Amino acid sequence: MVDGSIHVPVQSHEGQHDNSSSLNEEIQTSQDPLGIVESYQESSTSDFDKSHYTHNSSIAAADSEYGSAFIQGQSSNGSEIKSERPSIDKKLDVNIDSHPIEPPPFEHDIGLPASQVPAAEEEVESTPKAKPLYFLLDKRFWIVFFLGQVLSLCITATNTFNGYMSGISNIPAFQTFLVYALLTLVYTPYTVFRMGFKKYFEMIFRHGWKYIIFAFFDVEGNYFVVLAYQYTNMLSASLLDSWATVAVVILSFIFLKVRYHWSQILGVVACIGGLVLLVVSDVISRGDYSAVNPGLGDGYMIIGATCYGVSNTLEEYFASKLPLYVVIGQLSLYGSIISIIQTFIFDRHHLYTLHWTSEMGGYLAGFILVMFLLYSLAPILFRMSSATFYNISLLTSDFWSLVIGIHVFGYHVYWLYPIAFVLIILGLFVYHVFVDATRESIKPWLKKGQGVDGVGTVRRPPSLVSSNDELNKKNDIVVAHHDNEVKERIYDAYLSVKNVFVRKS
């Protein structure tokens, strides 16, 4: 129970009339040690709803942030007993030492379901207003912006390592497996350490199905995108890859009930427009974009981009509710299982005939380390901003690839490239021009008592439970998954799509 909770011993029904005076004394003595209630009792009587006293339950209410609490009861003569501990706004001379403040919660402290939250507090405004260009003075925006470019550089680095390895080997599923395996070795033991074996396996049995779905879309997104480049040309692949951004916007709108400002949609369109200019520049400058089977390759790219969209949306949802080590650990655990199965199905012949060299080992090690960094940092960006901003930030990776290509592969810069890069960067700024940078951090789908306080999150006053209770430390992560909520969101998304295509009779 958080600090400020009030426990009132309740007498049995038979002894209510005989002990009403002792009950009054106990309430006033335990909850009003400074004698404040008497001066406020009469004035506060009309401010509260009248309710009957329940004899078979204790009365408890807490408001840890504002410091107010209320008790209602009924004495033997039918009059109501009311007690109020005044809030900080009363500016009374109260001994603060008698009400110690709990330390801030840590990454593992998870909010309880809304039904278990003891007291209601003021909601955080779900759509903060922002003056035009005010975001330029917001430190949080610049952190999100530069973090997005770091992740974009990670994508560029992985593409570079893939480019080197493509001439030596063709083992995309095995490469992905090694990335998931490293993530599992790092994050899963730490998750077990924080939760304990019993609660960890309880989470696996009760909530593993969610992470299997999450990991499946992530693995298949990686697989189909790599596969698409073997059949279609770079022009089609680059354009269709931007479908991941559109998919995230649609899925966030339907599944997470996110509502976008018109300036955010304009920013997304500007970023995609910049990507189109990049592709056109490639066509003009390099020209030869023959494809083995463009129809099949385009289909693979659409499937892969859609899987990326689903994966990013789910990761933003999970990262807002759970510690990062749980989200990454579960994704990598099930991802490694799925990817090793695909490796034996699709890559086993290549592995048997592969000639390992130190050069290939270096490229593979670089690919794995960069992907490890990408998977570790991406959930932080999901918390601080959104999956949509993450995807439009990655669109600059084509420009960074050109910069590397100039120095490594001897590429020549076409004049449309700088314009395209500026247009993408402009789109990132337009995305936040009329919207507070903290708006997406609030996560409107989080209810009271939900959410996690950790790296990149915005503190939500009613969202956390005390970290001092050892029982909560072990149970919070299991409780915070909210099985029914996920199923309800999936069903609501189904109804939303159905209502679009099916007319009501």
UniProtKB/Swiss-Prot annotation:
GO molecular function, one term: transmembrane transporter activity
Transmembrane spans: 141-161, 173-193, 208-228, 235-255, 265-285, 290-310, 326-346, 362-382, 389-409, 415-435
SUPFAM superfamilies with a match to the protein in the record: Multidrug resistance efflux transporter EmrE (SSF103481)
Residues annotated with Phosphoserine modification: S463, S466, S467
This protein's record includes keyword Transmembrane helix: yes
Any one of the GO CC terms: Golgi membrane
Localisation per UniProt entry: Golgi apparatus membrane
Lineage: superkingdom: Eukaryota
Membrane topology type: Multi-pass membrane protein
Pfam families found in the cross-reference section: SLC35F
Major localization class: Golgi
Comp. bias regions, Polar residues: 18-32
UniProt xrefs under InterPro entries: SLC35_F1/F2/F6 (IPR009262), SLC35F_Transporter (IPR052221)
KW Transmembrane (keyword) present: yes
Keywords: Golgi apparatus, Membrane, Phosphoprotein, Transmembrane, Transmembrane helix, Transport
Region (Disordered): 1-52
Family label: Belongs to the SLC35F solute transporter family.
Protein name as it appears in the record: Uncharacterized solute carrier family 35 member C320.08
